[in-house]
Amino acid sequence: MPRIKDGFKGERAIVLPAFLIEELKQDPLGSELYITDIGYYPHAYFHYRKRDTEEVTEFILIYCMEGEGWFELDKHQYAVTANQFFILPEHQAHAYGSNEENPWTIYWIHFNGTKAAFFSAGFDRPKSITPQEDSRIKER
């Protein structure tokens, strides 16, 4: 099976420039919680990422909008289904990918800051979100 980290049809990604991230790190308010990268991967066939500890310099939130995927953290593997999210902590090796038969559609955010660990606490396992009539997710 091929493994792809990006390049999906219809994908969107924004990576903040390094100088802007450095400014945020110095800002009294901005340094508490800031985004470094944000994106959307629709129907991400063969999506796969594996990072060693030294490569993980931010927290990573992944929200599965459709389909299925998985992630590995601390030698445990977790299944992820539609309307679930998880946050991978900084400085921890991990891997994740889409299901071969039913690949996920995901939104993802890399973030950091002095309050990032507080913000992400308890979300290192899949958490479900129940869509509501006024969720507006389909408008995105």
Predicted regions mapped to residue ranges:
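Amphipathic alpha-helical segments enriched in hydrophobic/aromatic residues interleaved with Lys/Arg
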Residues: 118-140
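Short, structured coil/loop segments at alpha-helix boundaries
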Residues: 17, 113, 134-135
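A short, N-terminal "cap"/entry segment at the start of jelly-roll beta-barrel domains
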Residues: 1-34, 129
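N-terminal regulatory/effector-sensing and dimerization cores
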Residues: 30-126
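Generic detection of long, well-ordered alpha-helical segments
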Residues: 28, 58, 131-135
